[in-house]
Curated annotation (Swiss-Prot):
The protein's name in its UniProt record: O-methyltransferase 9
InterPro entries according to UniProt: COMT-like, O_MeTrfase_dom, Plant_O-MeTrfase_dimerisation, SAM-dependent_MTases_sf, WH-like_DNA-bd_sf, WH_DNA-bd_sf
Family of this protein: Belongs to the class I-like SAM-binding methyltransferase superfamily. Cation-independent O-methyltransferase family. COMT subfamily.
E.C. number: 2.1.1.-
Cystines in this chain: none
GO biological process: biosynthetic process; methylation
Binding-site list for S-adenosyl-L-methionine: 200, 224, 249-250, 263
Source organism (scientific name): Dictyostelium discoideum
Top-rank taxon: Eukaryota
Record keywords, A-Z: Methyltransferase, S-adenosyl-L-methionine, Transferase
Gene from which the chain derives: omt9
Pfam families cross-referenced by the UniProt entry: Dimerisation (PF08100), Methyltransf_2 (PF00891)
Length: 357
C-alpha cells in the first residue's frame, strides 16, 4: 500500500536546464509555490544564525559551521545542502562536507544589500501574518495584523522596533534599486521646480539624490511619520544642506510645494484612503504643481510578472491594498479630482505624473 510518502518523478530538464513538459512544469510548481512555506522557514534559519556571514571569510567544514551555530552536524549538513541545491552556497566537490560562499550568499551577509529583505520577509511576524491568507481570499478582506496583536500594519512599529528597523532598511533597498532608473530617466526633469517634497520618503535617500543631481532645486523636503524619520537607526538618514526632514501625517497635512514625489506609497492603502491622501496633498499644492507617482502599473496586455503579482498579494494581506492597472489608477485620480497628465515610459517601476483638475 502506498504510504503517501513515495517520491513522485521530479522535473526533467534538458542540457540548458530548461523545464520541458507540462508534467515537469507542474512538478516545478510543487517545488516552488506549493512548498514555498518550507523555503521561507529554511531561509529564516539561515538569517537567524548568520550563516552567510560565517562563510564570508573562506570555506568551512561542516564541523566548523555546526560548532559556530550550535547545531548538530547532521542537521547542519542538511541545512547547507538544501541551499547548495538553491545556489545560495556551494560545496567543494573534491572535499564533500566543506561549504563556501557564493556571490548570492554575499548579498545576504550582514554587509550585503539584500540582508534586510531576507530578514524581514522570513521574519516570524511576517510569517505569522500570512497564516490567515486563505481566510483573506474567502472574506475579501484581511485581518492578518490581528494575529500579531495590532489593528493595522503600521502599529507594528511601536511594538516591534526591530521589525520597524528591518522595514526601513528594506525600503532603503527598494529605493537604491530604483534611484538610477529615476535619476537617469529622459522623461522626467525636476530642474523646473523650486521645492520638491518626497511624501513617505523614509530617510530621504531619493530626494537627497535628486538634490545632488538638480542644483536648481532650492529646497528638498523628506516628509514621513515621526516613527520613521526619528527611528532608532539615524545612520540611515540622508544629509544634504538643502534637505529638511519633516515628520507628519499625510492624512492631516503636507508641506506646501510645486512638486511632490511618492514612491510606492499609494499601493499601501485602499482606494478610499488613497483619495484622502491625494485630497490632503491637493490643499498644499501651489498653482500648476505636479505629483510624480512611482507605482506599479499592471498591464494585462503585456502579461503578469511574478514581481507585480507577488507585491499585489503582499499588499492585500498586510494592508488591504493592491497594485493597479492604468484604468484603475485613472478611476482613483478621478475620485480625488486629479487628472493623469502622462505615463513616463522609461521608468521600470512605473511612473505617472498627475495634477489637479
Amino acid at each position: 500500500m502506498d504510504s503517501g510518502l513515495s517520491t513522485p518523478q521530479l522535473p526533467i530538464t534538458n542540457m540548458n536546464n530548461e523545464i520541458t513538459t507540462d508534467w515537469d512544469k507542474a512538478m516545478n510548481l510543487i517545488m516552488t509555490c506549493v512548498s514555498g512555506h518550507i523555503h521561507s522557514r529554511m531561509f529564516n534559519i539561515v538569517m537567524k544564525l548568520n550563516i552567510c556571514d560565517i562563510l564570508e571569510d573562506g570555506p568551512k567544514s561542516i564541523k566548523q559551521v555546526s560548532d559556530t551555530i550550535g547545531m548538530d552536524e547532521n542537521s547542519c549538513f542538511r541545512l547547507l545542502r538544501y541551499f547548495v541545491a538553491h545556489e545560495l552556497f556551494s560545496e567543494d566537490k573534491s572535499n564533500i562536507g566543506t561549504f563556501e560562499k557564493t556571490s548570492i550568499s554575499t548579498m545576504f551577509s550582514s554587509k550585503g544589500k539584500l540582508r534586510p529583505m531576507g530578514e524581514r520577509y522570513t521574519h516570524d511576524l511576517h510569517y505569522k501574518m500570512f497564516e490567515s491568507l486563505p481566510e483573506t481570499f474567502a472574506n475579501g478582506h484581511s485581518n492578518a495584523t490581528k494575529s500579531v496583536g495590532v489593528n493595522h500594519f503600521w502599529e507594528l512599529f511601536d511594538l516591534h522596533p526591530q521589525y520597524k528597523d528591518l522595514f526601513n532598511q528594506t525600503m532603503k533597498v527598494y529605493t537604491e534599486a530604483a534611484i538610477s532608473n529615476i535619476t537617469q530617466s529622459k522623461g522626467i526633469d525636476f530642474s523646473q521646480y523650486d521645492t520638491v517634497v518626497d511624501i513617505g520618503g523614509n530617510h530621504g535617500l531619493l530626494i537627497g539624490n535628486l538634490l545632488e543631481i538638480y542644483p536648481t532645486i532650492k529646497h528638498g523636503i523628506n516628509f514621513d511619520l515621526d516613527v520613521v524619520i526619528n527611528s532608532s537607526d539615524q545612520t540611515l538618514r540622508y544629509s544634504h544642506p538643502r534637505l529638511t526632514h519633516i515628520p507628519g501625517n499625510f492624512f492631516e497635512s503636507v508641506p506646501e510645494s510645486d512638486c511632490y514625489i511618492m514612491k510606492f506609497i499609494l499601493h499601501d492603502w485602499p482606494t478610499q484612503d488613497c483619495v484622502k491622501i491625494l485630497k490632503t496633498i491637493s490643499k498644499s499644492m501651489k498653482p500648476n504643481a505636479k505629483i510624480h507617482l512611482f507605482e506599479i502599473i499592471i498591464d494585462p496586455r503585456k502579461g503578469y510578472s511574478k514581481y507585480e503579482t507577488y507585491i499585489d498579494i503582499l499588499m492585500f494581506q498586510m494592508v488591504n491594498a493592491k497594485e493597479r492597472t492604468l484604468d484603475e489608477w485613472k478611476e482613483l485620480f478621478e475620485l480625488a479630482d486629479f487628472k493623469l497628465e502622462r505615463v513616463v515610459d522609461d521608468i521600470k517601476t512605473g511612473c505617472m505624473v498627475v495634477s489637479k483638475k
